[in-house]
Protein backbone atom coordinates (compact mmCIF):
# COMPACT_ATOMS: atom_id res chain seq x y z
CA UNK A 1 0.00 0.00 0.00
CA UNK A 2 1.46 3.37 -1.06
CA UNK A 3 1.38 6.31 1.31
CA UNK A 4 0.48 9.68 -0.13
CA UNK A 5 3.01 12.54 0.13
CA UNK A 6 0.62 14.29 2.52
CA UNK A 7 0.54 11.34 4.96
CA UNK A 8 4.30 10.85 4.75
CA UNK A 9 5.09 14.52 5.34
CA UNK A 10 4.43 14.61 9.14
CA UNK A 11 6.65 11.54 9.55
CA UNK A 12 9.50 13.10 7.57
CA UNK A 13 9.15 16.39 9.47
CA UNK A 14 9.33 14.54 12.79
CA UNK A 15 12.35 12.53 11.59
CA UNK A 16 14.14 15.72 10.50
CA UNK A 17 13.41 17.29 13.88
CA UNK A 18 14.74 14.28 15.82
CA UNK A 19 17.91 14.29 13.69
CA UNK A 20 18.54 18.02 14.09
CA UNK A 21 21.16 19.37 16.52
CA UNK A 22 18.61 21.71 18.10
CA UNK A 23 16.08 18.97 18.88
CA UNK A 24 17.53 17.84 22.22
CA UNK A 25 17.79 21.39 23.55
CA UNK A 26 14.29 22.30 22.36
CA UNK A 27 12.81 19.15 23.97
CA UNK A 28 14.58 19.94 27.25
CA UNK A 29 13.32 23.55 27.16
CA UNK A 30 9.78 22.30 26.55
CA UNK A 31 10.02 19.84 29.48
CA UNK A 32 11.32 22.58 31.81
CA UNK A 33 8.60 25.01 30.72
CA UNK A 34 5.92 22.34 31.20
CA UNK A 35 7.26 21.62 34.71
CA UNK A 36 6.98 25.31 35.64
CA UNK A 37 3.41 25.45 34.28
CA UNK A 38 2.30 22.28 36.10
CA UNK A 39 3.99 23.34 39.38
CA UNK A 40 1.90 26.54 39.35
CA UNK A 41 -1.37 24.99 38.20
CA UNK A 42 -4.22 23.14 39.98
CA UNK A 43 -2.22 19.94 39.32
CA UNK A 44 0.75 21.15 41.41
CA UNK A 45 0.02 18.96 44.43
CA UNK A 46 -0.32 15.86 42.23
CA UNK A 47 3.00 16.72 40.55
CA UNK A 48 4.92 17.08 43.83
CA UNK A 49 3.20 14.07 45.46
CA UNK A 50 4.14 11.90 42.47
CA UNK A 51 7.81 12.88 42.79
CA UNK A 52 7.77 11.87 46.47
CA UNK A 53 5.97 8.58 45.79
CA UNK A 54 8.10 5.63 46.88
CA UNK A 55 8.69 2.83 44.40
CA UNK A 56 10.56 0.12 46.28
CA UNK A 57 13.42 1.58 48.34
CA UNK A 58 13.51 4.98 46.59
CA UNK A 59 11.15 7.83 45.76
CA UNK A 60 10.37 8.54 42.10
CA UNK A 61 12.59 11.65 42.28
CA UNK A 62 15.51 9.56 43.56
CA UNK A 63 15.00 6.92 40.86
CA UNK A 64 15.21 9.69 38.28
CA UNK A 65 18.21 11.47 39.82
CA UNK A 66 20.20 8.41 40.92
CA UNK A 67 19.30 5.69 38.41
CA UNK A 68 17.98 7.30 35.23
CA UNK A 69 20.70 9.95 35.26
CA UNK A 70 23.33 7.19 35.49
CA UNK A 71 22.37 6.44 31.86
CA UNK A 72 23.00 10.09 31.00
CA UNK A 73 26.43 9.88 32.64
CA UNK A 74 27.11 6.61 30.80
CA UNK A 75 26.61 8.49 27.53
CA UNK A 76 28.77 11.38 28.79
CA UNK A 77 31.53 8.89 29.62
CA UNK A 78 31.29 7.28 26.17
CA UNK A 79 31.58 10.71 24.51
CA UNK A 80 34.57 11.66 26.67
CA UNK A 81 36.40 8.41 25.88
CA UNK A 82 35.70 8.64 22.14
CA UNK A 83 36.79 12.27 21.94
CA UNK A 84 39.94 11.65 24.02
CA UNK A 85 41.08 8.64 21.97
CA UNK A 86 39.67 9.19 18.51
CA UNK A 87 38.15 12.68 18.24
CA UNK A 88 38.63 16.38 18.84
CA UNK A 89 40.54 15.73 22.08
CA UNK A 90 42.87 13.09 20.64
CA UNK A 91 45.84 15.48 20.31
CA UNK A 92 47.25 18.06 22.71
CA UNK A 93 46.97 21.01 20.27
CA UNK A 94 43.24 20.30 19.91
CA UNK A 95 42.81 20.03 23.67
CA UNK A 96 44.53 23.30 24.53
CA UNK A 97 41.92 25.96 23.66
CA UNK A 98 38.78 24.18 24.93
CA UNK A 99 40.73 22.83 27.91
CA UNK A 100 42.02 26.24 29.02
CA UNK A 101 38.64 27.87 28.30
CA UNK A 102 36.82 25.15 30.28
CA UNK A 103 39.17 25.70 33.24
CA UNK A 104 38.40 29.43 33.20
CA UNK A 105 34.70 28.64 32.96
CA UNK A 106 34.85 26.41 36.04
CA UNK A 107 37.08 28.59 38.23
CA UNK A 108 35.58 32.11 37.82
CA UNK A 109 31.92 31.14 38.45
CA UNK A 110 33.02 29.25 41.58
CA UNK A 111 34.94 32.34 42.77
CA UNK A 112 31.94 34.65 42.19
CA UNK A 113 29.67 32.24 44.09
CA UNK A 114 32.20 31.88 46.94
CA UNK A 115 32.65 35.67 47.28
CA UNK A 116 28.89 36.14 47.71
CA UNK A 117 28.44 33.17 50.08
CA UNK A 118 31.77 32.92 51.95
CA UNK A 119 30.18 33.70 55.32
CA UNK A 120 27.60 30.88 55.11
CA UNK A 121 29.10 27.35 55.12
CA UNK A 122 25.74 25.73 54.25
CA UNK A 123 25.37 27.85 51.10
CA UNK A 124 29.06 27.54 50.24
CA UNK A 125 28.46 23.83 49.54
CA UNK A 126 26.95 24.91 46.23
CA UNK A 127 30.15 26.51 44.88
CA UNK A 128 30.21 24.09 41.92
CA UNK A 129 26.60 24.71 40.80
CA UNK A 130 27.41 27.58 38.36
CA UNK A 131 30.48 25.80 36.97
CA UNK A 132 28.62 23.46 34.57
CA UNK A 133 27.51 23.81 30.94
CA UNK A 134 24.49 21.98 29.50
CA UNK A 135 25.78 20.58 26.19
CA UNK A 136 22.31 19.83 24.75
CA UNK A 137 20.92 23.28 25.59
CA UNK A 138 24.03 25.21 24.46
CA UNK A 139 24.46 23.33 21.17
CA UNK A 140 20.71 23.56 20.59
CA UNK A 141 20.82 27.37 20.80
CA UNK A 142 23.95 27.58 18.61
CA UNK A 143 22.43 25.28 16.00
CA UNK A 144 19.47 27.67 15.62
CA UNK A 145 21.90 29.90 13.70
CA UNK A 146 22.48 27.14 11.14
CA UNK A 147 25.28 27.80 8.66
CA UNK A 148 25.70 31.36 9.97
CA UNK A 149 27.83 29.95 12.79
CA UNK A 150 31.18 28.47 11.63
CA UNK A 151 31.46 24.71 12.20
CA UNK A 152 34.68 25.39 14.14
CA UNK A 153 32.58 27.19 16.79
CA UNK A 154 30.30 24.16 17.16
CA UNK A 155 33.33 21.89 17.57
CA UNK A 156 34.83 24.30 20.14
CA UNK A 157 31.59 24.50 22.15
CA UNK A 158 30.98 20.73 22.04
CA UNK A 159 34.56 19.96 23.10
CA UNK A 160 34.50 22.56 25.87
CA UNK A 161 31.16 21.22 27.16
CA UNK A 162 32.52 17.65 27.20
CA UNK A 163 35.54 18.79 29.24
CA UNK A 164 33.12 20.72 31.45
CA UNK A 165 31.16 17.51 32.02
CA UNK A 166 34.40 15.71 32.87
CA UNK A 167 35.20 18.39 35.46
CA UNK A 168 31.68 18.08 36.88
CA UNK A 169 32.02 14.29 37.21
CA UNK A 170 35.32 14.71 39.09
CA UNK A 171 33.79 17.40 41.33
CA UNK A 172 30.79 15.17 42.14
CA UNK A 173 33.03 12.19 42.93
CA UNK A 174 35.37 14.19 45.19
CA UNK A 175 33.25 16.87 46.86
CA UNK A 176 29.72 15.42 46.92
CA UNK A 177 30.35 12.00 48.39
CA UNK A 178 28.57 10.99 51.60
CA UNK A 179 29.96 8.64 54.25
CA UNK A 180 31.82 5.79 52.59
CA UNK A 181 30.85 2.14 53.06
CA UNK A 182 34.13 0.30 52.49
CA UNK A 183 32.56 -3.15 51.78
CA UNK A 184 30.37 -1.73 49.01
CA UNK A 185 33.20 0.46 47.71
CA UNK A 186 35.47 -2.59 47.62
CA UNK A 187 32.82 -4.54 45.71
CA UNK A 188 32.54 -1.60 43.28
CA UNK A 189 36.31 -1.67 42.68
CA UNK A 190 36.19 -5.44 42.04
CA UNK A 191 33.33 -4.97 39.54
CA UNK A 192 35.25 -2.17 37.80
CA UNK A 193 38.28 -4.49 37.66
CA UNK A 194 36.12 -7.18 36.00
CA UNK A 195 35.06 -4.62 33.38
CA UNK A 196 38.70 -3.67 32.82
CA UNK A 197 39.77 -7.32 32.42
CA UNK A 198 36.96 -7.94 29.91
CA UNK A 199 38.21 -4.95 27.92
CA UNK A 200 41.82 -6.17 27.95
CA UNK A 201 40.74 -9.70 26.97
CA UNK A 202 39.02 -8.33 23.88
CA UNK A 203 35.42 -9.02 24.87
CA UNK A 204 33.34 -7.03 22.36
CA UNK A 205 29.79 -8.20 23.14
CA UNK A 206 27.92 -5.40 24.91
CA UNK A 207 25.69 -7.56 27.15
CA UNK A 208 28.43 -8.57 29.67
CA UNK A 209 29.45 -4.91 29.99
CA UNK A 210 25.87 -3.75 30.52
CA UNK A 211 25.16 -6.42 33.16
CA UNK A 212 28.40 -5.51 34.95
CA UNK A 213 27.49 -1.81 34.71
CA UNK A 214 24.17 -2.41 36.50
CA UNK A 215 25.99 -4.37 39.24
CA UNK A 216 28.57 -1.57 39.48
CA UNK A 217 25.77 1.01 39.85
CA UNK A 218 24.26 -0.98 42.75
CA UNK A 219 27.56 -1.18 44.63
CA UNK A 220 28.47 2.48 43.99
CA UNK A 221 24.98 3.61 45.03
CA UNK A 222 25.32 1.79 48.36
CA UNK A 223 28.95 2.84 48.88
CA UNK A 224 28.18 6.53 49.48
CA UNK A 225 29.85 7.73 46.27
CA UNK A 226 27.19 9.24 44.01
CA UNK A 227 25.75 6.48 41.84
CA UNK A 228 26.04 8.41 38.56
CA UNK A 229 29.83 8.03 38.78
CA UNK A 230 29.23 4.34 37.98
CA UNK A 231 27.95 5.35 34.55
CA UNK A 232 31.19 7.14 33.69
CA UNK A 233 33.42 4.35 35.04
CA UNK A 234 31.50 1.72 33.05
CA UNK A 235 31.71 3.86 29.90
CA UNK A 236 35.49 4.12 30.13
CA UNK A 237 35.70 0.30 30.04
CA UNK A 238 33.65 -0.14 26.84
CA UNK A 239 36.02 -1.05 23.94
CA UNK A 240 36.55 1.64 21.31
CA UNK A 241 37.96 -0.77 18.70
CA UNK A 242 35.76 -3.25 16.77
CA UNK A 243 36.20 -7.00 17.01
CA UNK A 244 39.37 -8.18 15.22
CA UNK A 245 38.86 -10.44 12.22
CA UNK A 246 35.21 -9.43 11.78
CA UNK A 247 35.04 -7.50 8.47
CA UNK A 248 31.25 -7.80 8.57
CA UNK A 249 31.09 -5.80 11.79
CA UNK A 250 33.41 -2.78 11.78
CA UNK A 251 31.39 -0.84 14.35
CA UNK A 252 33.01 -0.78 17.79
CA UNK A 253 31.01 -1.60 20.96
CA UNK A 254 31.47 2.00 22.13
CA UNK A 255 30.05 3.47 18.92
CA UNK A 256 27.15 0.99 18.97
CA UNK A 257 26.21 1.87 22.54
CA UNK A 258 26.69 5.60 22.01
CA UNK A 259 24.46 5.49 18.94
CA UNK A 260 21.84 3.40 20.78
CA UNK A 261 21.76 5.79 23.77
CA UNK A 262 21.94 9.17 21.99
CA UNK A 263 18.25 9.64 21.18
CA UNK A 264 16.78 7.94 24.31
CA UNK A 265 18.98 10.16 26.50
CA UNK A 266 18.20 13.34 24.52
CA UNK A 267 14.46 12.76 24.22
CA UNK A 268 13.57 10.65 27.28
CA UNK A 269 16.19 10.70 30.07
CA UNK A 270 17.17 14.39 30.09
CA UNK A 271 13.62 15.74 29.50
CA UNK A 272 12.29 13.54 32.34
CA UNK A 273 15.05 14.93 34.58
CA UNK A 274 14.16 18.45 33.47
CA UNK A 275 10.45 17.92 34.06
CA UNK A 276 11.06 16.36 37.50
CA UNK A 277 13.47 19.05 38.70
CA UNK A 278 12.51 22.34 37.02
CA UNK A 279 9.11 22.53 38.68
CA UNK A 280 9.20 25.54 41.00
CA UNK A 281 6.04 26.67 42.77
CA UNK A 282 5.93 30.47 43.04
CA UNK A 283 3.00 30.28 45.46
CA UNK A 284 4.05 31.91 48.74
CA UNK A 285 7.55 32.54 47.41
CA UNK A 286 8.86 35.87 48.66
CA UNK A 287 10.54 38.37 46.34
CA UNK A 288 13.54 38.40 48.69
CA UNK A 289 14.49 34.96 47.32
CA UNK A 290 15.62 36.69 44.11
CA UNK A 291 18.05 38.83 46.10
CA UNK A 292 19.36 35.99 48.25
CA UNK A 293 23.10 35.44 47.91
CA UNK A 294 22.53 31.78 46.98
CA UNK A 295 20.29 32.70 44.03
CA UNK A 296 22.50 35.64 43.02
CA UNK A 297 25.69 33.61 43.33
CA UNK A 298 24.37 31.01 40.88
CA UNK A 299 22.77 33.54 38.52
CA UNK A 300 25.86 35.77 38.33
CA UNK A 301 28.20 32.79 38.30
CA UNK A 302 26.47 31.34 35.25
CA UNK A 303 25.78 34.57 33.37
CA UNK A 304 28.90 36.61 34.17
CA UNK A 305 31.39 34.09 35.54
CA UNK A 306 31.01 31.69 32.64
CA UNK A 307 31.30 34.23 29.83
CA UNK A 308 34.22 36.14 31.36
CA UNK A 309 35.96 32.96 32.54
CA UNK A 310 35.66 31.12 29.22
CA UNK A 311 36.38 34.10 26.96
CA UNK A 312 39.14 35.51 29.19
CA UNK A 313 40.97 32.19 29.38
CA UNK A 314 40.52 31.58 25.63
CA UNK A 315 41.74 35.11 24.75
CA UNK A 316 44.80 34.67 26.97
CA UNK A 317 45.60 31.25 25.45
CA UNK A 318 45.31 32.59 21.89
CA UNK A 319 47.26 35.80 22.52
CA UNK A 320 50.13 33.94 24.22
CA UNK A 321 50.34 31.42 21.38
CA UNK A 322 49.25 28.44 23.49
CA UNK A 323 46.27 27.83 21.20
CA UNK A 324 44.74 28.98 17.92
CA UNK A 325 41.44 30.78 17.41
CA UNK A 326 38.70 28.56 15.87
CA UNK A 327 39.00 28.76 12.08
CA UNK A 328 36.65 31.29 10.46
CA UNK A 329 35.36 32.62 13.79
CA UNK A 330 35.60 36.25 14.88
CA UNK A 331 36.33 37.44 18.41
CA UNK A 332 32.69 38.53 18.75
CA UNK A 333 31.48 35.05 17.77
CA UNK A 334 33.89 33.46 20.23
CA UNK A 335 32.52 35.76 22.93
CA UNK A 336 28.95 34.79 21.96
CA UNK A 337 29.80 31.11 22.43
CA UNK A 338 31.37 31.97 25.80
CA UNK A 339 28.03 33.48 26.85
CA UNK A 340 26.23 30.28 25.77
CA UNK A 341 28.49 28.35 28.16
CA UNK A 342 26.44 29.95 30.95
CA UNK A 343 23.54 27.64 30.08
CA UNK A 344 24.04 25.26 32.98
CA UNK A 345 20.64 23.63 33.33
CA UNK A 346 20.98 19.83 33.66
CA UNK A 347 24.34 19.49 35.41
CA UNK A 348 23.89 22.67 37.50
CA UNK A 349 20.53 21.55 38.90
CA UNK A 350 21.96 18.07 39.45
CA UNK A 351 24.89 19.42 41.52
CA UNK A 352 22.46 21.73 43.35
CA UNK A 353 20.35 18.75 44.43
CA UNK A 354 23.50 17.10 45.81
CA UNK A 355 24.56 20.31 47.58
CA UNK A 356 21.41 21.26 49.47
CA UNK A 357 19.01 19.02 51.40
CA UNK A 358 16.48 21.79 52.19
CA UNK A 359 13.56 22.46 49.83
CA UNK A 360 13.99 26.25 50.10
CA UNK A 361 17.67 26.14 49.13
CA UNK A 362 16.89 23.76 46.26
CA UNK A 363 14.20 26.19 45.05
CA UNK A 364 16.65 29.11 45.24
CA UNK A 365 19.18 27.00 43.35
CA UNK A 366 16.68 26.23 40.58
CA UNK A 367 15.65 29.89 40.27
CA UNK A 368 19.31 30.89 39.98
CA UNK A 369 20.03 28.17 37.41
CA UNK A 370 16.93 28.85 35.30
CA UNK A 371 17.39 32.64 35.27
CA UNK A 372 21.16 32.48 34.67
CA UNK A 373 20.72 29.89 31.91
CA UNK A 374 17.88 31.85 30.26
CA UNK A 375 19.90 35.10 30.26
CA UNK A 376 22.91 33.28 28.81
CA UNK A 377 20.82 31.62 26.09
CA UNK A 378 19.05 34.83 25.02
CA UNK A 379 22.09 37.13 25.13
CA UNK A 380 24.41 34.58 23.53
CA UNK A 381 21.96 33.89 20.70
CA UNK A 382 21.28 37.60 20.02
CA UNK A 383 25.00 38.45 19.93
CA UNK A 384 25.83 35.52 17.63
CA UNK A 385 22.88 36.38 15.38
CA UNK A 386 24.03 40.01 15.14
CA UNK A 387 27.64 38.95 14.49
CA UNK A 388 26.52 36.64 11.67
CA UNK A 389 24.61 39.33 9.76
CA UNK A 390 26.21 40.32 6.44
CA UNK A 391 27.64 43.83 6.48
CA UNK A 392 25.85 46.37 4.26
CA UNK A 393 27.59 48.54 1.74
Curated annotation (Swiss-Prot):
Catalytic activity: Na(+)(in) + 2 H(+)(out) = Na(+)(out) + 2 H(+)(in)
One biological process term in Gene Ontology: regulation of pH
GO cellular component entries: plasma membrane
InterPro entries listed in its UniProt record: Na/H_antiporter_dom_sf, NhaA
Membrane topology term: Multi-pass membrane protein
Residue ranges crossing the lipid bilayer per the database entry: 23-43, 58-78, 96-116, 126-146, 155-175, 178-198, 201-221, 224-244, 265-285, 298-318, 334-354, 367-387
Pfam families, sorted: Na_H_antiport_1
Any one GO MF annotation of this record: sodium:proton antiporter activity
Free-text function comment from the UniProt entry: Na(+)/H(+) antiporter that extrudes sodium in exchange for external protons.
Similarity annotation: Belongs to the NhaA Na(+)/H(+) (TC 2.A.33) antiporter family.
NCBIfam families associated with the record: NhaA, PRK09560.1, PRK09561.1
Protein name per the record: Na(+)/H(+) antiporter NhaA
Source organism (scientific name): Brucella canis (strain ATCC 23365 / NCTC 10854 / RM-666)
Amino acid sequence: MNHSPQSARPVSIMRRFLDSEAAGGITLMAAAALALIVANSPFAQTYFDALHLYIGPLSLAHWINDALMAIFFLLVGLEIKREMLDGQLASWPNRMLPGIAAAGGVILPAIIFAVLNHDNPAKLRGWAVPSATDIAFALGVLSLLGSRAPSSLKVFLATLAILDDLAAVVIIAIFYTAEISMPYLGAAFITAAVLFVMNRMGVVKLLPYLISAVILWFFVFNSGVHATVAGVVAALMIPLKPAPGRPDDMTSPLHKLEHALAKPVAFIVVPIFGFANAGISFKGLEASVLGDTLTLGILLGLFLGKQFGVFGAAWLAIKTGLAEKPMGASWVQLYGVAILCGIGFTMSIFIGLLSFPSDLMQTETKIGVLSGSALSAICGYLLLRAAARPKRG
